[in-house]
Amino acid sequence: MDNHTVKEIISPKSYCDMIEKIDETKKERHFFAAANSKNGFVSYFDDIFGDESISRIYLLGGGPGSGKSTMMKRVAEISKKNGYTTDHIHCSSSPYSLDGVIIAEKGIAVIDGTAPHTYIPYAAGVREINIDPGAAWNTNALFKRRNTIYALTDAKKKQYRKAYIYLRAAGLLDTESREMTDPYILHEKLQKNAVSSVLSASPKKHSSNPGKISIRIQRAVSSAGNIYFESFAGAADKTFLINDFRGAAKIWFDEAYIQAKKSGLDMTISYSPEDPAIIDGIYFPASKTAFTMYAEKFDKIINCERFADKRGIINIKQKLAFASKTRSSLLAEAYKALADAGRYHNEIEAEYYPCTDYSITDKITSELCEKIFS
């Protein structure tokens, strides 16, 4: 692949531009709850859906082609029509599908309870209620298609293994680049900016009690490419766009996070999908202020280039260029593997469609909506 093709593949793209137009507002929010990362598949389901504000979770079973995502989209649609704050939790591998819905005012969530993002119930039958979309399957008809389904499933798994190998290798190069650059980061200047930015976005009176920390992921390394949402910016009254330079944004967010914890602020954190140790966004609900790396509309830019000794970095420019080019090529291969995995998944679902009675699926969906909204 030439450099232009590689850059096109790995560049972050807005979900609205790549897949479909959506509203990202204070009432309608879109996130991910898992990531394809250098560590393999990482799930934040327990952190997000284990939140004490959620009093009931409907766990959807079944499998490919059983209509789970369609069910959740129907729940989200009714929730929005009723004026509830609705978090759409998209699948990190197939962003056009949903893995979950959270209805804030009702304290209710509906989530995909199947692998790989399984959720461990806290009180099954009390807090967590099982729903089985698989009841709509004709299992005898599916059994006749088993050889095709097995072959496609194995091919899909192979592509995921390949993607994680490339992501792990790209992660090693990213770590190496950060270590080379760190001596040329103006840490004191960066820290002062991060601290003052957080303090300006926080209430005048700080709490001595720990603030509540929530997790919502803004971006995904997916079969559809490098896709991000702008729901931090959509929920905010004031948005700061953080422009990275040679990894300085990671350090900036680390310092901002430390200060926010010291101040006892409630905050919502987003982590990079490639590396779960890297923060790429912080939202403060009390002041409705967002610091994020993904926003088309924003109030102020914090350019991290100002926190680097650019003359010093010239000394390692060639090494950084080599690492960046190699890392980009590895990421491009990871995206290709994920795209292939996505195609195999679609073919698996196509095997299930003729073996599913969607009138039963519709009935299950109606009963679920009745339980939630009655």
Task: Give the role of each language-model region.
Residues 2-3, 148-200, 322-365:
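An accessory alpha-helical subdomain
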Residues 3-49, 188-231:
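N-terminal pre-Walker A segment at the start of P-loop NTPase domains
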Residues 12-40, 77-148, 260-335:
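Conserved nucleotide-sensing/catalytic segment adjacent to the nucleotide-binding pocket
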Residues 23-82, 234:
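N-terminal accessory targeting/assembly segments
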Residues 57-76, 224-260:
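Glycine-rich phosphate-binding P-loop
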Residues 60-61, 71, 79, 87-92, ...:
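A cross-family "folded-core" feature that marks the main globular domain of proteins
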